[in-house]
């Protein structure tokens, strides 16, 4: 009688595996036909080690390694192919889904994945960090009093892929910029959606005495909103932020209630606002300006637009660009370039003051591509200048001409064309464009 051994085989479930450097230990299942003894080894233990008996892999570093299983013949089975292997690639990114506690991102870190727990994610002082397809969804629970992402000091954020960050409690922003005297810079080619709580900014500061430093956006597509009384980008309720600078990318900023789209929230303040490029759309839901100050004694510094395409609107008593409602203010408004479309839904000016508020001054030069400003509803409000019940605002100068009336017809202009239009209700639009030589 001739006894023939069985034909054995081994194979891994996956021919290749991709992991992140902070992922937990794992096993790629091995299918075995027969009763041979298997041992495992890693070609590069500086990337990952493997338990020789169980095949469980522990990630050590980043790079690529080959995990190999070797089986021996037995009395019952013979193995023509005695090895099986797979390639393991370890990405240097930090996988938020694998975190088991709070994490402070260090310089050079790439964050990715969806945060699975209610953990505080911060950026170390001075660190440059990439956000790559992250999702941080705050739960709006007072047990977790922090922002979706907190900058501990100066921070540089590069966005790639699609990213979404939401604060964990109503008083906290989606992204908390660093303290006063620091700068948060956002750039890249991806998208970022940042959502603050009821009393906080989307990007900036939180509620009641909170503050933050400067905010600079120079790339990517950034959508920032407050669920309530904060600015989309800037300060929260009764809070403050530093200067806001936008030089590139596409920016959408909005507040659903009394804050500005870009600027200050309710009873709040922010520094200078500068836009020199990109596509910017900013809106306030109720009594704040589209770009500028919020409601009830809020303030912002100078507003300067030198380029880009800017669309700013207030749905109620604030200006499109300028100050919000009720004792609010803004500094000097200067528009020297770009295409600007600003309008107020009710008692505010298109560019200037909100109802019962002020602006420092308005200067529009001949270097613009186009400026269009609309007042709606209240005939006392100007398209460019004073809102309803203005509190003694400063001078209005358009291409060197001092404007003293809401009924101005462009008299005195030499470098700009002036057009006026209305749909027959109380709205009024002024459009300024360069004269062609």
Residue ranges and their predicted role:
Residues 1-92:
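Solvent-exposed beta-strand/loop surfaces, strongest in extracytoplasmic domains of secreted
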Residues 91-437:
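A composition-driven surface/loop motif
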């Amino acid at each position: 009688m001739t006894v023939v051994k069985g034909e054995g085989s081994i194979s891994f479930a996956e021919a290749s595996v991709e992991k992140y450097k902070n992922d937990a230990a794992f096993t790629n299942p091995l299918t075995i036909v027969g009763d041979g003894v298997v041992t495992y080894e890693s070609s590069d233990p500086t990337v990952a080690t493997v338990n020789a008996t169980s095949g469980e892999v522990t990630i050590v570093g980043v790079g690529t390694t080959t995990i190999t299983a070797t089986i021996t013949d037995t009395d019952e089975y013979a193995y023509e192919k005695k090895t099986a292997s797979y390639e393991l690639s370890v990405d240097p990114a930090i996988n938020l889904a694998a975190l088991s506690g709070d994490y402070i991102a260090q310089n050079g870190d790439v964050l990715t994945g969806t945060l699975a727990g209610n953990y505080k994610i911060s950026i170390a002082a001075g660190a440059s960090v990439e956000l790559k397809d992250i999702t941080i969804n705050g739960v709006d629970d007072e047990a977790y009093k922090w922002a979706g992402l907190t900058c501990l000091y100066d921070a540089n954020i590069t966005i790639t892929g699609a990213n979404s960050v939401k604060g964990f409690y109503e008083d906290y922003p989606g992204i908390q910029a660093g303290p006063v005297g620091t700068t948060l810079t956002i750039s890249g080619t991806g998208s970022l959606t940042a959502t603050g709580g009821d009393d906080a900014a989307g990007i900036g500061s939180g509620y009641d005495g909170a503050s933050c430093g400067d905010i600079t956006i120079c790339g990517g597509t950034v959508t920032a909103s407050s669920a309530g009384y904060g600015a989309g980008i800037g300060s929260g309720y009764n809070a403050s932020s530093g200067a806001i600078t936008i030089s590139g990318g596409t920016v959408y900023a909005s507040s659903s209630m009394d804050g500005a789209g870009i600027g200050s929230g309710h009873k709040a303040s922010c520094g200078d606002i500068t836009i020199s490029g990109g596509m910017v759309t900013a809106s306030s839901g109720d009594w704040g300006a589209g770009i500028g100050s919020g409601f009830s004694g809020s303030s912002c510094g100078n507003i300067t637009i030198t380029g880009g395409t800017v669309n700013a609107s207030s749905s109620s008593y604030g200006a499109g660009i300028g100050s919000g409602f009720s004792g609010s203010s803004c500094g000097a408004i200067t528009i020297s370039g770009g295409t600007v479309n600003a309008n107020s839904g009710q008692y505010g000016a298109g560019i200037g003051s909100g109802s019962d508020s002020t602006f420092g001054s308005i200067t529009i030069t001949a270097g613009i591509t186009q400026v269009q400003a609309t007042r709606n509803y209240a005939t006392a409000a100007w398209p460019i200048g004073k809102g309803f019940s203005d509190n003694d605002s400063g001078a209005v100068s358009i291409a060197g001409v001092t404007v003293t009336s809401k009924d101005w017809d462009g008299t005195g202009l030499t470098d700009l064309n002036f057009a006026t239009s209305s749909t027959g209700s109380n709205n009024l639009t002024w459009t300024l464009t360069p004269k062609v030589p």
